[in-house]
C-alpha cells in the first residue's frame, strides 16, 4: 500500500480502535460506573464490560482488542506487499472476533456497549481499507526480463503472436 490518504486513514482507524479498547480496558478494571456510556438497560457499557463474556480465560477482551489494534498499526507502517497480506488476514480475524462479540451483545446479553460498537466500526473500516490496499495477483508476476533474457511472466493464452 502506498502512503496516500487511504494509508493514513488506515493508521487513524488503528489508533481509534486502540484508544477505544484502552478506554474499555480501563472501564473493565474500574470500580466506578461510566456515566458517559451507561444510557439505559439497552446501552450499558458497565454491564457488558463486567459480564462473563468480557474475559477469555481471565484475559480481558479489551486487552485482546488493544493488542490486536497495536499489531494492525505496526503492520500498517509497512508498504510491503507481503505484509499487506498479513495485515488483511489479521484484520479479517479481528473482524470475525468483533462480529462474534456483537452477536453476544445482541442475543445473549441483550445490551450494547458504545465503545464496543465503535471498535466494531473501526475494525470494519480497517478490514475494508486493508482489502483496498491489496494489489491484484497479476502485480506479483514480474514482466521485466531476467539476466538470461527470459521474461518471468506467464504466457497469455489469448496472445496469438
What are the residue ranges of the model-derived segments?
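Membrane-interfacial helix-loop segments of redox and metal-homeostasis proteins
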Residues: 1-159
Amino acid at each position: 500500500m502506498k502512503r496516500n490518504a487511504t494509508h493514513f486513514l488506515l493508521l487513524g482507524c488503528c489508533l481509534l480502535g486502540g484508544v477505544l479498547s484502552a478506554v474499555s480496558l480501563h472501564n473493565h478494571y474500574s470500580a466506578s460506573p461510566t456515566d458517559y456510556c451507561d444510557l439505559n438497560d439497552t446501552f450499558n457499557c458497565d454491564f457488558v464490560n463486567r459480564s462473563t463474556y468480557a474475559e477469555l480465560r481471565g484475559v480481558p477482551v479489551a486487552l485482546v482488542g488493544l493488542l490486536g489494534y497495536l499489531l494492525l498499526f505496526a503492520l500498517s507502517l509497512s508498504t510491503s506487499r507481503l505484509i499487506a497480506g498479513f495485515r488483511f488476514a489479521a484484520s479479517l480475524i479481528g473482524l470475525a472476533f468483533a462480529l462474534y462479540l456483537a452477536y453476544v451483545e445482541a442475543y445473549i446479553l441483550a445490551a450494547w456497549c458504545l465503545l464496543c460498537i465503535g471498535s466494531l466500526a473501526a475494525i470494519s473500516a480497517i478490514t475494508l481499507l486493508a482489502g483496498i490496499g491489496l494489489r491484484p495477483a497479476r502485480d506479483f508476476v514480474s514482466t521485466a526480463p531476467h539476466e538470461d533474457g527470459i521474461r518471468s511472466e506467464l504466457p497469455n493464452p489469448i496472445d496469438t503472436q
